[in-house]
Amino acid sequence: MRAVSQTSPNRLAEALSSPHMLKEMLDLFGHEYLPVFEGEIKPHGPLGTSDSRAKRPLNAFMAFRTYYLKLFPDTQQKNASGFLTQLWGGDPHRNKWALIAKVYSFLRDQLGKGPVNLSAFLGIACPLMNMVEPSIYIEVLGWEQTAPQGIVTFQQNTDIMKANLARLFNVHPTTEIDLLTSILSAGYFTDFSQVLLMRMWACQNGIMTTTSATAGNNVATTQPLYESVPTTAEKVSFINAVRESRNLAAHDLFGPEYDAAFFGNRFVHSWEVQDLTSFQNVQISVADSPMESNTLYNFRMPSQCLPQVSEFDLYDVIDTSIIDISSAWSIDQYLHEKQSKMQQQCKYFLFRNSDCS
């Protein structure tokens, strides 16, 4: 520290303009060095936007989803989201994605959402973290696309994945400040590099990741990612009640009219699994639109009010959406949408024919 204090201001400023040099200085003399800049290193100081409150941290899956969405350029958004959820279930680098998401959240809170575009940030951070490029992701991770009965799914061969990942170069930053330093050293946010590094160092909330090719979810943190939820006797009692009988628990919570038959008639399905990564290739029926429940469905509706569609084609539904065929309202909704689409097509062809004539 004495040597630093005796260094000329110009020489010191030149040295500290290097993010790597500044990080080394902070690691050595941070506790003595930072108080000089106390007014600048507050977590949400002059760099912040007009709304200086910290926003919700970016979810690791959302970072993954944004980076690999380009895998399905010609796929409908809802289908692409389903595919990416399945790929996420077999991704071995969730700890690295958590690290990337934390650094993005930090920069967004410091500089504002405008200057820190997520897609642009991932284009910088992911190569620095040696994430698998989208163009080779499916092949490297051992995924194979199948389409039984027209339903596209992915199957993963973990042996192929491990062999492929073992051949890849896997040196990467292992803490938040390491990744931030690498980003700043690459020439991004240079006008704010010093104060950004000092603020992150002062926060002391870095995530440690392992360098294993298949590190999985192993994330060691200097402090918890999320604050723990306090446990109360009431919570413990209710959780135990749900474990013993979820129907009785709902009955006690909502009232006597909410019994097993009530929930059963509403086509609300649930699955209990030990690990979400093993919950794959399951078609989950979505909830009905907010309207009268199926138990109140009017089965005596006049025939002229029903959709005039000749038949219900199951294979038409596969690429459209997932519906519950035990729900009368869901069937009618699908048939009505099909009828409307057919009418629009007829109008279009009539319009074209009239122009041709």
Swiss-Prot record:
It is found in: Nucleus. Belongs to the MATALPHA1 family. GO terms for cellular component: nucleus. GO terms for biological process: positive regulation of mating-type specific transcription, DNA-templated. Residues 53-108 bind DNA. Pfam families: MATalpha_HMGbox (PF04769). GO terms for molecular function: DNA binding, bending. This is Mating-type protein MAT-1. Its main location: nucleus. Keywords: DNA-binding, Nucleus, Transcription, Transcription regulation. It comes from Fusarium oxysporum (Fusarium vascular wilt). Mating type proteins are sequence specific DNA-binding proteins that act as master switches in fungal differentiation by controlling gene expression in a cell type-specific fashion. Transcriptional activator that induces the transcription of alpha-specific genes.
